[in-house]
Each structure stands twice: as structure tokens, then as C-alpha cells.
């Protein structure tokens, strides 16, 4: 009998422990790989949010930003994500059409170069696309000058990468109906096309290309983290394309309250102060930028297609790009 009582007590302890674990709510956030990396914003944001939510915040990487949309379209209502973080305005119209997202209910004074009134997609950072190169590389200030040069570049695939898709929108915004010819002329300059930003940037750092498609903020990483001021970005005369990255709440999440809390957290200093020195982008709300950001290239002009226009032209631009580079 004594042995049986001990056994029951042990089982009771295990059940209590299991119940305690089960009561810890979990919020799943689907995002891009670099956000979850040890050098990305994910770890610091996870620590900060868990300290105030008594929850488990789980980030899941799904490739680069554009791959998020493909995964959502595949999973539909079966997704276990409560938050999707890492789409941009070139994808939000298509994402909205999935019917997966609910209004975020967050109000904030955003520091974006464009007006923002979207009640579903909440901006968490932004930046200008640009080609990043060594300072001693002769700069170019237009796509035409780049195509006419001997410079070698690395870009990202627009089907899986938001910077890659942004480049297509940028070329389209500048060259319109002549964009397909521009891609044909650029083909000789392109060393390779990578699935995502990380692979492309690493090839540039390895000396495989003269320049890489990235952001005007990318040199800040080298300056601040490595004390290296040898990198720069190029402002184009016609303007540089703007990227605004967003988060959204999944409508059918079983952690509605926690998801709402995290969406509000995104627009707080605890989240936003992490962005400049981990995601190396501009924060979406007023905050103090680190020393070194004041040295960055600031384009004289920014350009951004509306989310609906981007959705309308996306497939055609991707097909024209694919055709030009396969010739």
C-alpha cells in the first residue's frame, strides 16, 4: 500500500507539472529566416515580450519574405501561426485576398516616408532598396548606367525574396514598358540570382560580385558592428524604391488576446529599439537612431507602388524578368 501511495503521489506531481506547462500560452510567429537568426531581432524581441506576457513566443522561419505568402496560400486556415511578420507592401494585397487576417487595432505615430492607414497590416520597419558596394567601386546612379558597365551584381529571386520583388517594382517604376529590355541588358551583369537576401549578401562579402541588392542601411552594420567604413550604397537619380515591412494577425488564431498584445508590442519602443542594430532597417515609430545612421546614403527621391498596383503587375513583371534572364 505504501508503494502504491508513493506511485499515486508521483503521478499527481507529474500531472500538476504537466498542467502548469499546458497553461503557458504559446504564440507562433511566422517570419523570414534572418529575423529568427542569432544576429537578427528575434532573440531580443522574444526575451522582451516573454518578460511581460508570461507566455512562450515561438518564431518560425520560412525562407525569405516572399516565401511567407506562398506558405500562407498553401496552408490557408490550417496555419498554426498567430502572427505573420515580414511581408511587405508589394505582397499585402495578395495576402489580404487570402482572407486570413484580422484588423490589428493599433494606433501609432509612424515615421514612414509615406502616409499609412492600413488597419490590417502594421508596419514594423522600412528602408530604401539600393546596391551596396565597396566605396572604391565606381558608383552608378541609374539602371541604364549599371547595364552599360562591366560591374557584376548579385540579386535575389523575386519569387521568394521581398528585396528581389522590390527590385522588379523599382525597375518597372523607372522604366515602365522598357523594363523587359533593361533586364535583357542587365543579364550580363548578374553573377547569380539567390533565393534570399542572406545568400546574396554573403556572396558579395566573399568578393563574388562588385555590388549586391540590399538597402541603404546595410553599411551601418559594417560601421557599427565591425568598425568598417568601407561599404556604401548608391542613390539612383530617378529615386530608390521603398520597402515597408509589415506584420498581421491571423484571424482564426486560438491566441487572439496574445496576438493582439504582440501587435501592440510591435509599435512599442521595446520592439522598435531593437530594429536598427539587428534588422539594420529604420524603425517604424519615433526612436533614437544609433550613431552611424547619420552617415548613410539618403536618396533624394523614394518611390513606392500602391499595394494594389504591385499586385496587378507582379505576375507579368516576374515572367518578363524570367524570360529576359533565361535567354
Predicted regions and their residues:
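Mature extracytoplasmic/periplasmic domains
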Residues: 250-304
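A ligand-binding cleft/hinge motif common to bilobed small-molecule-binding domains
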Residues: 90-94, 205, 209-230, 279
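Short alpha-helix C-terminal cap/hinge motif
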Residues: 43-59
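Extracellular/periplasmic bilobal clamshell ligand-binding domains
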Residues: 292-327
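Gram-negative bacterial Sec-dependent N-terminal signal peptides
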Residues: 1-21
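A bilobed periplasmic-binding-protein/Venus flytrap-type ligand-binding module shared by bacterial periplasmic
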Residues: 130-137, 172, 243-256, 274-277
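Extracytoplasmic ligand-binding site segments that recognize negatively charged/polar headgroups
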Residues: 26, 30-42, 63-67, 79-209
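Periplasmic-binding protein-like
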Residues: 114, 127, 183-187, 193-194, ...
